[in-house]
Amino acid sequence: METIIEVKNLVKNYGDKQILKNISFNINKGEIISIIGESGAGKSTLMRCLNGLEGINSGSIKFYDTDITKLKEKEKNSIKKQMAYVFQDLNIIDNMYVIENVLVPFLNRKNFIQVLFNQFSKQEYERALYCLEKVGISKLAYTKAKYLSGGEKQRVAIARSLAPNVDLILADEPISSLDEKNSTQIMEIFKRINIKKNKTIILNLHNVEIAKKFSDKILALKNGEIFFYKKSAEVNEDDIRKVYQTS
């Protein structure tokens, strides 16, 4: 299988505190990977490093065959256009229509005048509507985002991540504020995207049972280190207990 992410000996510090310690793992194209662990284990930091939002102190992160940690900012931005990041706080703009929120990624490809006057092409609008249809909220395209529920806003964020037709989607705690029903629906959307479009998806999740149900593999972090990285079907109750066990 083709490797899309290769991490070797990654170290990340904040000042004198080491957040990630000698992290190494591979992710194959088309896999769903869930990252689990206690709060403060380094999950969100790892996600941001993988996307290039955070620099690292040592080690390497390869996207396909390119080490993104050695790129200049312009080159890094070109690579990041092949990735989408669903932030924990979603970054949905309440006073914009749903479809306008989904169109936001296309702004990076436009000049100042086009951005100023929201000049989007017919193809971009069609792509945005297509993505909203895939997450089941195309009827809300011309609704102001401030009127949406939490679950609907999460769907908008996922649709926005699909709009640029990227290879890799990273979602930081995409279901943390949702009830069980909405959490399952959101994970089913990720699974459909994964199966039908062969997208690689990396998720930061607190719900271990949902992680096991919808992921191909689970990467468990503990105190900034990899505690285990294995197929979801191989993860047992003892593994989970040890991840969340305090010494």
Curated annotation (Swiss-Prot):
Reactions that this protein is recorded to catalyse: phosphonate(out) + ATP + H2O = phosphonate(in) + ADP + phosphate + H(+)
Subcellular location per the Swiss-Prot or TrEMBL entry: Cell inner membrane
GO molecular function terms noted in the UniProt entry: ABC-type phosphonate transporter activity; ATP binding; ATP hydrolysis activity
Q: EC no.?
A: 7.3.2.2
Keywords in alphabetical order: ATP-binding, Cell inner membrane, Cell membrane, Membrane, Nucleotide-binding, Phosphonate transport, Translocase, Transport
| Entry annotated with the keyword Cell inner membrane | yes
Protein name as it appears in the record: Phosphonates import ATP-binding protein PhnC
Instruction: Please state the gene responsible for encoding this protein.
Output: phnC
